């Protein structure tokens, strides 16, 4: 911590760093014009940056330049149990690697406070219509994840600065919003803005509090945990002015789905967004959090709101201590982060979004930005032909378009009291009119916080949700993360036998193909009250605005408008029922972690038969060998919008998959296969998930008529034999054949899972060439020593007529964003050898990334640094 510009903070016993003065000393009048993000980044530079580069780094912010890297030191790391666990498995493996070479393994410790919340492990095996669902689901979670939870318990005693919130307590982002983020930190007598990175792409949830919170992969999180700076260049900072006021009956979910569509079209990929204007000013923090949560869905890195009175009211409402709330207000006003101090902020680009034009929406059938107004469902071909569906229902059959899953799920919506209370009020009115859930609908309610249950019970609507089948099944991610659990066997068999077009409706944040459930062919995102309405309707063919949900006792038709609660009803009940005491009752005991014994050994005692936790291989064998970048074969040629769900799916493991066959061989019963996500601590299981998504289109796998065959398939060259992806990977591994992947636009969008990069690296992939990369996945590729290259504008796999028979090499000097040459060697139709030289851009974006890549990845770099004594 530096000393220059360190001053007493008026009205407290604390000190702070006067970033305003530091900036004004360089350029008078500049500070007031800085965006919120730049002010926070400038403060941490003044507080922690090497004085030798401080002025240059501040000038980057003042002059809006992107010429030089500067360090970012996040104050905290938050993890969920999937990526958080794999990060700690990596650190445990790093300890072993260091011990094997004579080093001291106990030196490997997080130095930045790290909080791990177990929230990704629970599958909804029992739906919300079972009164004992919560206890049953938790018991199954504990049984299936005993290996994982044993390791996580060990980390609490083996590593310093690691706190664990065990399973059954809520979702990481919601707990971060409601409790963990102080907004303003107080450490060593110094006040400064809270910042954090999290091992999940929805970490920006707490941007709603004015806290820069960024989703990263597990590898980058490990880097931050160990006290390394996260080097960056000034990001694009875009102002988003929210004008107008929402129409009656419009939820924050409707707004965020419309915003996601709008911002995707505006191409804000990688940018830090700052929301302001009358629309932002009038929003509660709950509504703001719904918007910030879906940052990755519109492609941005952060979605900030200024600190204002609404922030202060929320901190008070959620039970923060009065002294802490006072510190947030006084510090924000002192340093110029208060909303009224941001009126002079200048943005190089400002977008304008009118809240008054937002209608009731859903998104689907397979992308969060594919918004559909509920008024247009028939015109879009989603609703319609309801008579046929109802005729099937009358015959005792599951109807066309059946909603087989209806889930109120996800921190996106369950951290917003207005949304959950609205669902409860709609359920109450539906019950009063005699409406019921259709029997084939697996309904569930999984709030991200125990506080939600307390205020819904206080509001008197929890019992109404339970009556309609939306009892609480868990406090975890569940369906939103693809952990929707098994269907009733008879329902599943009918779907298979009749090839029923079945769907899911959920209040989550993602609906990529194959993510929610293997037998839900498509999925739609909707607000919590709409989820309840669709459970009553029972089919997506139902026009939610105009079709009748049923009849009352007098035979009169009931429509959505008849049960939709008014804004006044919702707001009055929220005001009456949500209280600080509820949050204190939940969080005070949860965070009373007490004293912990130190582990007897710094080395983990690996269980050889475990399919969940295994010593990682990253410092040995082929991964320790240099990459050739020569004579590479393509493993896959892929279209636009490849997601990390395509690259390494998270959902349930099926018996006929490569991972399922492996688990069966290891003696695991099929009912305990669990999800791909839960096995990511064991590379032997997890690598079999690489490209295991049945919805994948590998353009190398074509039918005789030239159409692309869907599935987890690859074509092995030079033989041209098509086989399952995992068998192709094994074939190439046995041949020690280096591989390449060719892709289209927006490669790697979606979840921040590092196994989307680890899997391809273990497969032998050395290079990925795409038209564009999503930020987190590109960083993960670098962290695994995979070289990301970007086609120049106007060049792509189609213009080059690539078909997968080629050999590829890369030549040139690897440097940040340097020009390299992709050399493509192939045979022409007349049997001649053709060589094409394709200019590409090296997407190692900083000098630090070049160093990491040259070391073979961050894990190899860590080992080198610890053995050489270059620890943080």
Per-segment meaning from a language model:
Residues 1-872:
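Fe-S-dependent hydro-lyases/dehydratases of central metabolism
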